[in-house]
A protein has these predicted regions:
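Long, highly charged low-complexity segments
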Residues: 1-117, 131-142
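A structural signal for well-ordered alpha-helices, especially hydrophobic packing surfaces
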Residues: 8, 99, 244, 248, ...
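A short structural micro-motif
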Residues: 16-18, 216, 293-296
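Active-site-proximal helix-loop-helix substrate-binding element of RNase H-like nuclease domains
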Residues: 65-76, 108-253, 263, 267-271
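Generic beta-strand/beta-sheet core signal
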Residues: 100-103, 120-122, 153-154, 162, ...
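Membrane-interfacial loop-to-helix junctions in multi-pass inner-membrane proteins
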Residues: 255-258
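Extended, well-ordered alpha-helical scaffold/bundle regions in very large, multi-domain proteins
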Residues: 261-296
Length: 296
């Protein structure tokens, strides 16, 4: 449903939302990555507060006061030993829903190196597990393949990253990007912006801790110290979990919860599998279909 608005416009005359100028639109399920890379156009910082009004819309007449991670008592743990990983898994297993976030060296989920995974099951407490090899991931395989609800932001990216590293994450899922795209399709859905608008919170920015990458608008995350990356990634998981509590309520109030649960979310692993495996198409058939759709 989120992927076929242009066809809807042709069929029903509804004007489709204007395409973003960014090369990686956050609400495009077929975009290759979620990464917090430098935007194509840095939006001007509004001089107003982003008070929530039900969908994250800014109130331009309120003064902006954003809190940061240091304004809250928090516990972000680096799970870099077998003992720490075991303790993390034991704690997460007590919950039937938790959030996770992957960190990689680049924007390609299938080829770039996995640096670590963050987990969070309650606000202001999260873990970051550095990944140096397959053995580290084996410690969390039962979690990722277990029955708990997995929450994330642009989960398709994370599913593909872990699939490329030998783990097929099982649902159910909750994706904060998809949830916001469903209830507020005309707005941007980046996690940093949602944190400002819905939580009045300013996140750690990757551009402030990473070196410039080889390509324009890319960042090199490979040299970030584990402690710094750990705080950044743990905060990502923490804030995404907090956003999910708000967005779950908003999706329900919007009357689109059934659509979200039965159509949008089940498509996540399907799309991830398609991108991981690849699909074979006949150019002639695509051209024929394009002509037919264009004639509608």
């Amino acid at each position: 449903e989120l992927e076929f608005r242009s066809m809807q416009a042709k069929l029903f005359g509804k004007k489709a939302p204007e395409a973003r100028k960014s090369p990686l639109p956050a609400d495009d399920l077929f975009a290759p990555a979620q990464a917090e890379q430098l935007p194509a156009e840095a939006p001007a910082a509004p001089a107003a507060d982003a008070r929530q009004n039900g969908s994250g819309q800014m109130d331009l007449f309120e003064e902006r006061h954003l809190k940061t991670v240091d304004d809250f008592k928090h516990e972000y743990i680096i799970a870099d030993t077998e003992e720490a990983r075991s303790a993390m898994v034991a704690e997460l297993e007590k919950h039937d829903s938790w959030c996770f976030d992957t960190e990689t060296t680049g924007l390609n989920p299938l080829t770039d190196k996995l640096l670590g995974v963050a987990f969070c099951a309650e606000p202001h407490k999260a873990w970051y597990m550095p990944v140096s090899g397959p053995a580290d991931l084996e410690a969390v395989r039962p979690l990722l393949e277990g029955p708990a609800e997995k929450t994330g932001h642009h989960l398709k990216f994370d599913l593909e990253v872990l699939r490329a590293n030998g783990i097929r994450v099982k649902g159910p899922f909750f994706d904060t990007l998809l949830a916001h795209a469903l209830i507020a399709p005309g707005m941007k859905h980046g996690m940093d912006l949602l944190a400002e608008n819905l939580l009045q919170y300013s996140t750690i920015k990757l551009k402030d801790i990473a070196a410039p990458g080889a390509r324009k608008r890319e960042l090199d995350t490979s040299g970030i110290p584990v402690e710094v990356m750990g705080k950044y990634s743990a905060e990502d998981a923490d804030i995404t979990l907090q956003l999910s509590a708000i967005l779950k309520k908003q999706v329900k109030e919007s009357g689109m919860e059934e659509l979200f649960r039965t159509v949008e979310l089940p498509l996540l692993p399907v799309l991830a599998d398609m991108e991981f495996t690849g699909i074979r198409v006949l150019p002639e058939s695509l051209e024929e279909a394009s002509v037919k759709v264009g004639a509608i």
